[in-house]
Amino acid sequence: MATTKSFLILIVMILATTSSTFASLEEMVTVLSIDGGGVKGIIPGTILEFLEGQLQKMDNNADARLADYFDVIGGTSTGGLLTAMITTPNENNRPFAAANEIVPFYFEHGPHIFNSSTGQFFGPKYDGKYLMQVLQEKLGETRVHQALTEVAISSFDIKTNKPVIFTKSNLAKSPELDAKMYDICYSTAAAPTYFPPHYFATNTINGDKYEFNLVDGAVATVADPALLSVSVATRRAQEDPAFASIRSLNYKKMLLLSLGTGTTSEFDKTHTAEETAKWGALQWMLVIQQMTEAASSYMTDYYLSTVFQDLHSQNNYLRVQENALTGTTTKADDASEANMELLAQVGENLLKKPVSKDNPETYEEALKRFAKLLSDRKKLRANKASY
């Protein structure tokens, strides 16, 4: 009798724990962040293709798309373009691009985007005309409010000297931010020295003209927009019940996937303190952006890793990054077929690499684990909605 009673208690405890786990997973807020990096967007494009493929297998649904699983998708520069590709609706109100169409997009359009050189020493390297043309063709007249999930795309206004963040949740208070997606994508990609800044105008809530003079989102958020994406999610938590679980920065209730476009330590090997002590403004200008982006990206990852670890939720955060790019793969604008093939291979090889020195789990294994959580969470929410 005592044995039977103990067995029943054990069963109740297991069921209670399982129920609690499911409830916790159902409450999770999911965030995807994609770095900037020009043609190096092929690397996260490869990762996204793998992840979406896993979700399709797990849910036995060839039409499953990343926007179905993430509450917030944020990106900067080329990451902003990827964000738009996987969240902008087509005529069937589904993402106009599947993840397996991202890498082919770079191969088809990259050589044209990064080939229209102005030839001006004192002007931008590329005129941006083809980039705008293809963005208008792909994104049409779609505006922010039509995105299939919350987005967070950054840019910087050089007239007001302030960052501009395009999100759906800001539109009620700032309807002027409901810009066309092609204007936003060009703006977030308009890296100084590479493309001309972008001007466009919308209307305020009073119908007044509102002007934007924008450049690359990396100026506002550096190349890694993970903190921005998390901030958008936590801000929505104050108003949207679906995000309520992460109020008060409860990162235990957040799944964050951050995708990098690769970095390198090559410049560290070629410059010394003795050498750079003789440098002037021009020499520093050639490398300071690369150094700043690498350092800022590292600090963003360091902060997020620390926060999630302190909350014993380190498995809720995954940063996918290649830290050993070499040669032409370090360049954001080398759209030669040979280099793009190398970048695609970098993405494929990255899947087989360990997450870190302390974590032997490969990125492929970690992404499969993330995919399982995303799939289970979606099913739990769908079941709840059906009652």
From Swiss-Prot:
One of its GO terms (cellular component) is vacuole. Its EC number is 3.1.1.-. Residues 1-23 form the signal peptide. Its main location: other. Transmembrane segments: none annotated. A motif (GXSXG) lies at residues 75-79. GO terms for biological process: defense response; lipid catabolic process. Residues 32-230 form the PNPLA domain. One of its GO terms (molecular function) is nutrient reservoir activity. Gene3D superfamilies: Cytosolic phospholipase A2 catalytic domain (3.40.1090.10). Tuber and stolon. It holds the Pfam family Patatin. InterPro entries: Acyl_Trfase/lysoPLipase (IPR016035), PNPLA_dom (IPR002641). Glycans are attached at residue 115. It is an enzyme of class 3 (hydrolase). Residues 361-385 form a coiled coil. A motif (GXGXXG) lies at residues 36-41. It is found in: Vacuole. The keyword Chloroplast does not apply. Keywords: Coiled coil, Glycoprotein, Hydrolase, Lipid degradation, Lipid metabolism, Plant defense, Signal, Storage protein, Vacuole. The keyword Glycoprotein applies. Patatin have a dual role as a somatic storage protein and as an enzyme involved in host resistance. Belongs to the patatin family. Probable lipolytic acyl hydrolase (LAH), an activity which is thought to be involved in the response of tubers to pathogens. The nitrogen atoms of the two glycine residues in the GGXR motif define the oxyanion hole, and stabilize the oxyanion that forms during the nucleophilic attack by the catalytic serine during substrate cleavage. This is Patatin group A-3. It comes from Solanum tuberosum (Potato). The lineage of its organism: Eukaryota, Viridiplantae, Streptophyta, Embryophyta, Tracheophyta.
